[in-house]
Amino acid sequence: MARDITFLTVFLESCGAVNNDEAGKLLSAWTSTVRIEGPESTDSNSLYIPLLPPGMLKIKLNFKMNDRLVTEEQELFTKLREIVGSSIRFWEEQLFYQVQDVSTIENHVILSLKCTILTDAQISTFISKPRELHTHAKGYPEIYYLSELSTTVNFFSKEGNYVEISQVIPHFNEYFSSLIVSQLEFEYPMVFSMISRLRLKWQQSSLAPISYALTSNSVLLPIMLNMIAQDKSSTTAYQILCRRRGPPIQNFQIFSLPAVTYNK
């Protein structure tokens, strides 16, 4: 069963690109929704992971300008698509996905991400088989798959359909970095937390030996996997507040593009 969870709309504002020109002020409104696939009921002991191959995690964006849809025939759409495409390095190098495709479908720009850390076989080893073998065990998490992050952004400009593309990029970076830090890392660390995914990448080969060393069986595998996901020290907020040595903090300059002026 699939269900959608929508986050509160966020509003951003910036002045004109030249001398903080008030006339060139740009406003934007951002709304994001995640799609979750899994059992109908949820509880506090849920483990969220990205949709695994052959499925892929989709990052989907569509754009509006002054409440009007920006369509793929427009030059502005092309420039915004280039901005979205510039995030490939972030998804691949910091969150350990492979970007399989950057496509345009029905006026949406879609990134298709393949997880390089988890597979269905590993989920079977870590969760499904221990659950079947140890029916008496408690504390096992229920698996849910995050299949899509969909974002709609509405830009507002006093100058009609004129917008500096270089002025748009900070809005992209500020929104997505704040969304990841304040929401996605806490709710879906195995999908969007660099440190959680990095720890899983480093530690997954050690989980089975630890479980068998302590219990002579696989009973602890689901619990240890869930412990990695639930460790709040993996969040960027924790790393910043503690200012301690540890895994590197993410670089949130996610989007980039040389300054280009668009005028319809």
Curated annotation (Swiss-Prot):
Membrane-spanning intervals of the chain: none
Keywords assigned: Meiosis, Nucleus
Effects seen without this gene: Reduces meiotic recombination several hundred fold. Specifically affects meiosis, and does not have any detectable mitotic phenotype.
Primary subcellular site in the record, as a coarse category: nucleus
GO biological process, one term: meiotic DNA double-strand break formation
Cellular compartment(s): Nucleus
Any GO CC annotation of this UniProt entry: condensed nuclear chromosome
Keyword S-adenosyl-L-methionine: no
Pfam families in the cross-refs: REC102
Keyword Nucleus among UniProt keywords: yes
InterPro entries, alphabetized: REC102 (IPR048920)
Description of how the protein assembles with itself and partners: Interacts with REC104; seems to form a functional unit with REC104. REC102-REC104 interacts with SKI8-SPO11 and this interaction is required for proper subcellular location of the proteins during the initiation of recombination. Interacts with MEI4, REC114 and SPO11.
Function: Required for formation of the SPO11-mediated double-strand breaks (DSBs) that initiate meiotic recombination. May mediate the interaction between SPO11 subunits during meiosis. Also needed for homolog chromosome pairing, synaptonemal complex formation, and for the proper timing of the first meiotic division. Not required for mitosis and mitotic DNA repair mechanisms.
Protein family membership: Belongs to the TOP6B-like family.
Other notes: Despite weak sequence similarities, may correspond to the subunit B of a SPO11-containing topoisomerase 6 complex specifically required for meiotic recombination. Retains some of the structural features of the ancestral archaeal Top6B subunit (AC O05207).
Protein name stated in the entry: Meiotic recombination protein REC102
Originating organism: Saccharomyces cerevisiae (strain ATCC 204508 / S288c)
